[in-house]
Amino acid sequence: MNANAPVQPSLDDLLGRIVRDDVRAMGAYHVPDASGMVKLDAMENPYHLPAMLRDALGKRLAEVALNRYPVPTADALKAQLKRVMRVPAGADVLLGNGSDEIISLIAIAAAKPGATVLAPVPGFVMYAMSAQLMGLKFVGVPLRADLTLDREAMLAAMAEHQPAVIYLAYPNNPTGNLFDAADMDALLRAARGPVCQSLVVVDEAYQPFAQHSWMPRLPEFDHLLVMRTVSKLGLAGIRLGYVAGHPKWIAELDKVRPPYNVNVLTEATAAFVLDHVDVLDAQAATLRAERTRLIDALSAQPGVTVFPSAANFLLLRVPDAAGLFERLLKRRVLVKNVSKMHPLLANCLRVTVSNPEENAQFLDAFAASLQDTP
């Protein structure tokens, strides 16, 4: 062995030399094992497609040319989405591998030196994460104690930080509430006026359960994008998101979009299901009715606060979120403990609204777990 040979650095040293410090300090997104559980942690639609449609979809997918790349523009699917989802005339659409990819594309396109992304908090974690990974500053503006939007604080933050991008989730995740429409309108107008000049992205991932939308108002605001996903409608497994807005915004985002980001199976599945959107709409209506039933039942439990929800999940405040979460796990019910995400969410759990059978199992387990409180 040559004594003068350079010492080979350890793998940890090599990682430290190459990987960014902030990335090394991060933790990977953890998805818990839900095998054998009543799974109420991820805001999924509990319903399958009807058997007849599943058979027809299987035949459609069998005809897909898996040996060919997707058509990069996906013009046919975009035209179908515009028609079914009532995208206003004159607006254009961009597709993404889920909304997460679209959020990343917005961050890439807006990542000028010193640029800022602003959003109410607590909110969807990907707004901050995508900003951090692209080198943008993220500014979170706390909601009020009742989890409503703080218009004055938002306007002050917009004036101070001059954000490139403002995210407004409608309904908000993880709180589930719809922000006041007058507050939203005021922020939209301020973002294109004397306060700042910003792109505003309204995230409508849960729109099927809210039945309120900013999509019809796209023609009023040339700085507004409306982002949605098909995940919450019952297609979480195919990972398809879309964003609508002025064609000039869509053209800029399209420049940073990978050319084959939506695979052929996703495209074919979405096109098929959009021809049967009435089935998904009926499922959403059932879940809205179940949401009301859950709210009534949970509100009757001692020490439980149920926050208003226009989504397919409920945010609950309980005396001991960590303990109740563990007791639910022992009863094979998985919910989301969000109590450490933000101080405003202290002792809060987030629960997906499911079908009547799973909701009944959850309510039984919840009541029993409350009674087990030490």
From Swiss-Prot:
It comes from the Bacteria. Pathway: Amino-acid biosynthesis; L-histidine biosynthesis; L-histidine from 5-phospho-alpha-D-ribose 1-diphosphate: step 7/9. Its EC number is 2.6.1.9. CDD domains: AAT_like (cd00609). It catalyses: L-histidinol phosphate + 2-oxoglutarate = 3-(imidazol-4-yl)-2-oxopropyl phosphate + L-glutamate. Its cofactor is pyridoxal 5'-phosphate. Keywords: Amino-acid biosynthesis, Aminotransferase, Histidine biosynthesis, Pyridoxal phosphate, Transferase. The keyword Amino-acid biosynthesis applies. One of its GO terms (molecular function) is pyridoxal phosphate binding. Signal peptide: none annotated. The modification N6-(pyridoxal phosphate)lysine is found at K232. The keyword Cell division does not apply. One of its GO terms (biological process) is L-histidine biosynthetic process. Belongs to the class-II pyridoxal-phosphate-dependent aminotransferase family. Histidinol-phosphate aminotransferase subfamily. HAMAP family: HisC_aminotrans_2. Homodimer. This is Histidinol-phosphate aminotransferase 1. It comes from Ralstonia nicotianae (strain ATCC BAA-1114 / GMI1000).
